[in-house]
């Protein structure tokens, strides 16, 4: 039979062992989440459209450009991988710019449009039933005018917003 001191030491030892197992499990889970987040960032191409300003007209124009660009991407982007999507976008920056300019012209808006591939930081975002972790992502960015207004984004590859 164990003495009271031995029983206390045994319970303390078991408690410490469980605490260490729990800490190790939490560390391993956190590490998995970091690794998964890095994989998501590495295998994702985002579409990011930034409005001229936060005015109602600029925000409406941004959504009109979004619709035109997504329609163009639906018919033109054949990518089956992220590198293919980036290569396709790099070869079609001018066409994407023309698409955005044409959409703005339909609204009688004449403002500069800049289309570029960038690598930029995005905060954590909910997307449908999932979450995109914070991190640096490659993005096809379209700036309307100064690009200082609220933005709109989606995941271009893999095609969560369209087929690219």
Language-model features: where?
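Early exported N-terminus immediately downstream of N-terminal targeting peptides
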Residues: 43-90
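Short, Lys/Arg-rich N-terminal segment immediately upstream of the first membrane anchor
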Residues: 1-5
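Aromatic-capped interface at the extracytoplasmic side
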Residues: 25-38
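Mid-length scaffold segments of soluble, non-membrane domains
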Residues: 83-143, 147-150
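Hydrophobic membrane-insertion alpha-helices, especially the h-region
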Residues: 8-25
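Solvent-exposed coil/turn segments that connect beta secondary-structure elements
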Residues: 50-54, 70, 118-120, 145-147, ...
């Amino acid at each position: 039979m164990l003495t009271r001191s031995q029983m206390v030491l045994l319970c303390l030892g078991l408690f410490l062992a469980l605490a260490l197992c729990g800490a190790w499990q939490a560390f391993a889970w956190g590490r998995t989440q970091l690794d998964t987040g890095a994989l998501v960032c590495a295998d994702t191409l985002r579409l990011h459209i930034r409005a001229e300003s936060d005015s109602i007209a600029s925000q409406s124009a941004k959504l009109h450009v979004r619709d035109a660009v997504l329609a163009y991407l639906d018919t033109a982007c054949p990518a089956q991988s992220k590198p293919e999507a980036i290569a396709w976008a790099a070869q079609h920056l001018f066409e994407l710019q023309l698409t955005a300019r044409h959409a703005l012209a339909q609204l009688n808006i004449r403002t500069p449009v800049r289309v570029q591939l960038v690598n930029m930081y995005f905060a954590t975002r909910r997307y449908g039933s999932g979450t995109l972790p914070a991190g640096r992502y490659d993005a096809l960015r379209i700036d309307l005018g100064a690009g200082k207004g609220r933005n709109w984004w989606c995941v271009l590859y893999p095609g969560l917003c369209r087929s690219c």
